[in-house]
């Protein structure tokens, strides 16, 4: 593997050997790991270490940090009704749902009927108005289902009602600029030269079963899952329009360094000053749901408030860990057990989605070393 950046603390030398043997068909990848506030791994292959790419649902971790900042600053109460901040949300008997319940994927708003259009996705107010008017696809709180796309407009409208700013504006001012990190929700045009477009040359499935995901039923078999999936063209999310807009749920453009820097800024591991009140992050990262996900049609899924939680299906950390993975293989998480922050980006698309399991041995090794010291 052609490395364009090669720094590994000697204590974590095993990580380098694993990284060098990750799938040879990757267009490019980056990996940055911090332990107790110190960078112990900074690796890149086939892309510049400062290049950025679309990280899809890893964007949700950046948005969750933004909401946690509002919680810590006393501007947002997760146990307040969503309709308290956003009265129109009360339509179709949604008025008693709390912010925490809505943003832990329990509201039944994984899609609208009719579907959101590509144009609406890049107009948060249009998308949020459609979601406020939508009758839930299932009885809220009776089950949960991943609001893969729609949680973006839900978060954005909430932030707008509280601050008067879009979530992208608030994140830029309060989070990204403060962390001085290459992790954008809306990447400026002058930085486009540093963007590595997502490769669509080859689909590489993480479980090796390409035939399975080529079948019509694919990896969404339930009616809810079929209706919730495939609402928006992929080109809408990964094109310049998507990169410029920065949909809070799916259009972040980041480097692995940038991801790790934002998370480290937020948590302040290693005795640093946390940019977000620790109790707010702890509250948002507490597990809210676990089990069968209606929208993904998968078992063993779990979420806090926006943040994804590790399970046996996605074992990226201890029960205290929180973060989010992305459809093309990227991952960002923090684990207070060992004070680990990991950012990983991949510049290619693969199904069935989620973080690239090729880095699971790295996650396991880092956790073992970090918790032993």
Q: Predicted segment positions?
A:
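Short, gly/Ser/Thr-rich active-site loops of penicillin-recognizing serine hydrolases
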Residues: 247, 268-271, 285-293, 352-373
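Active-site helix/loop module of the DD-peptidase/beta-lactamase fold
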Residues: 49, 57-58, 72-114, 133, ...
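Active-site SXXK
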Residues: 13-19, 37, 54-80, 154-160, ...
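Active-site-proximal alpha-helical segments within enzyme catalytic domains
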Residues: 105, 151-158, 246, 250-272, ...
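Catalytic-site signature segments of enzymes, centered on catalytic residues
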Residues: 49-52, 111-194, 238-254
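A short, well-structured edge-of-sheet supersecondary motif
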Residues: 16-49, 78, 118-120, 331-335, ...
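Short active-site loop at a secondary-structure junction
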Residues: 22-32, 46-102, 139-149, 247
């Amino acid at each position: 593997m052609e490395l364009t950046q090669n720094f590994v603390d000697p204590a974590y030398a095993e990580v380098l050997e694993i990284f060098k043997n990750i799938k040879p068909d990757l267009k490019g990848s980056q990996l940055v790991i911090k332990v107790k506030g110190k960078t112990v791994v900074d690796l890149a292959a086939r892309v510049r270490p400062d290049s950025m790419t679309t990280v899809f649902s890893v964007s949700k971790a950046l948005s969750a940090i933004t909401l946690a900042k509002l919680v810590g600053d006393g501007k947002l109460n997760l146990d307040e009704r969503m309709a308290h901040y956003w009265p129109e949300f009360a339509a179709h008997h949604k008025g008693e749902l709390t912010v925490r319940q809505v943003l832990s994927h329990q509201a039944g708003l994984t899609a609208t009927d009719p579907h959101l259009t590509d144009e609406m996705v890049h107009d948060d107010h249009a998308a949020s108005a459609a979601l406020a008017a939508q009758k839930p696809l299932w009885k809220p709180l009776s089950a949960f289902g991943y609001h893969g796309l729609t949680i973006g407009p839900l978060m954005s409208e909430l932030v707008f009602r509280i601050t008067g700013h879009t979530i992208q504006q608030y994140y830029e001012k309060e989070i990204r600029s403060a962390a001085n990190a290459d992790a954008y929700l809306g990447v400026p045009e002058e930085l486009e030269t540093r963007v590595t477009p997502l490769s669509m040359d080859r689909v590489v499935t993480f479980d090796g079963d390409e035939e399975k995901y080529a079948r019509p039923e694919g990896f969404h078999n339930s009616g809810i899952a079929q209706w919730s999936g495939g609402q928006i063209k992929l080109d809408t999310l990964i094109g310049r329009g998507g990169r410029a807009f920065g949909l809070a749920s799916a259009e972040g453009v980041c480097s692995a360094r940038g991801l790790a820097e934002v998370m480290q800024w937020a948590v302040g591991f290693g005795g640093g000053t946390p940019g977000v009140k620790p109790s707010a992050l702890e509250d948002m990262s507490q597990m809210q749901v676990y089990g069968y996900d209606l929208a993904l049609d998968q078992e063993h899924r779990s979420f806090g408030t926006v943040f994804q939680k590790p399970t046996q299906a996605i074992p990226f950390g201890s029960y205290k860990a929180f973060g989010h993975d992305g459809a093309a293989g990227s991952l960002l998480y923090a684990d207070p057990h060992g004070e680990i922050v990991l950012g990983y980006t991949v510049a290619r698309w693969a199904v069935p989605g989620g973080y690239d399991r090729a880095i699971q041995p790295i996650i396991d090794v880092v956790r073992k070393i970090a918790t032993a010291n």
